[in-house]
Amino acid sequence: MVRAKRKLDHIEYALSTGQSRTHGFHDIDFVHQSLPNSSYDTITCETKIGELSLSSPIFINAMTGGGGEQTLHINEQLAYVAKHHNLAMAVGSQMAALKDESESASYKVVRKVNPNGIFFANLGSEATVEQAERAVDMIEANALQIHLNVIQELTMPEGDRDFTGVLQRIEKIVLKSKVPVIVKEVGFGMSKETVQQLANIGITAIDIGGQGGTNFAAVENERRQRMLSYFNNWGIQTATSIIEATSTNNNLSFIASGGIQTALDVAKAIALGANTTAFAGYFLRILMQDGVENLVDEIDLLHTDLKFIMTALGVKTIEELQSVPLVVKGETYHWLAQRGIDTAHYSRR
């Protein structure tokens, strides 16, 4: 019951705290093309994460599950949206269902609603190989997300305090997994050093989960008597984290998440090197406040606007969008300069 109550608390506080930090995309400017030589009608938005082919560079990221009927209903509606738009979708952490079989229905519902969809299972980095296999089987997943949430755990009153051996546990899962493994942050971003460590153990897809979206330090602080307020602004902004990650020059697929709300955010993230983008808090807020059909309509608009932007930039595919010229400025530029990452090549492509 404690875990289920926490799941419901997370939904409540995620909606009430909102996106309290900046994602950094205001520091990214496209170089305008007056002669784009492009047509809206010829644009395609297919992309890939590793060997997984996706019809859109937008997918529904992990949000919830394991909190009884309310989380079942949320996942049921999200799966309906995913089916309508043919989007990939991740479920929230499945540890609740591994501990209590009665909670498995709140995850299994996604496959029931969308039998042919692309779904990602989800567990924390404390998971064992056996737990990872069970999570994948539970929803017949196409991939497995392993989330890294050190700051959330430290801020969580009942959270973990020991993070030794995490990389070794992930490596064991990678070696045994029958589906691709995606490692993701939960709103605090990934550094180039972290990305390199993950690449070294065979990870081929990473969700950088940057600062700018749902602030899980703030969410957990709402549940504490004594707030750890020093964690509320902790992390690497999403735009910065994408550049850090891609600077490692590994042959990896990158997912950009963390405050993504608009088609312009999507376009900038892809132009910085992401293969796809993931929405969570923004979609959840629309679903809970305005209803499922409004979320369906919003995703329609996102795709329309993304195609408008691609037309303006003179590109026809997501791969071409990854090579358009842009300028990195402001705080993002200064951070990257201090980290020894040259951004000039973006503006000279």
Curated annotation (Swiss-Prot):
It catalyses: isopentenyl diphosphate = dimethylallyl diphosphate. Substrate binds at residues 6-7, 152. It is an enzyme of class 5 (isomerase). GO terms for cellular component: cytoplasm. Keywords: Cytoplasm, Flavoprotein, FMN, Isomerase, Isoprene biosynthesis, Magnesium, Metal-binding, NADP. It holds the Pfam family FMN_dh. FMN binds at residues 62-64, 93, 122, 184, 214, 258-259, 280-281. Its cofactor is FMN; NADPH; Mg(2+). Its main location: cytoplasm. InterPro entries: Aldolase_TIM, FMN-dep_DH, IPdP_isomerase. One of its GO terms (biological process) is isoprenoid biosynthetic process. It is found in: Cytoplasm. GO terms for molecular function: FMN binding; isopentenyl-diphosphate delta-isomerase activity; magnesium ion binding; NADPH binding; oxidoreductase activity. Transmembrane segments: none annotated. Involved in the biosynthesis of isoprenoids. Catalyzes the 1,3-allylic rearrangement of the homoallylic substrate isopentenyl (IPP) to its allylic isomer, dimethylallyl diphosphate (DMAPP). PANTHER family: ISOPENTENYL-DIPHOSPHATE DELTA-ISOMERASE (PTHR43665:SF1). Homooctamer. Dimer of tetramers. Belongs to the IPP isomerase type 2 family. This is Isopentenyl-diphosphate delta-isomerase. It comes from Bacillus mycoides (strain KBAB4). The gene is fni.
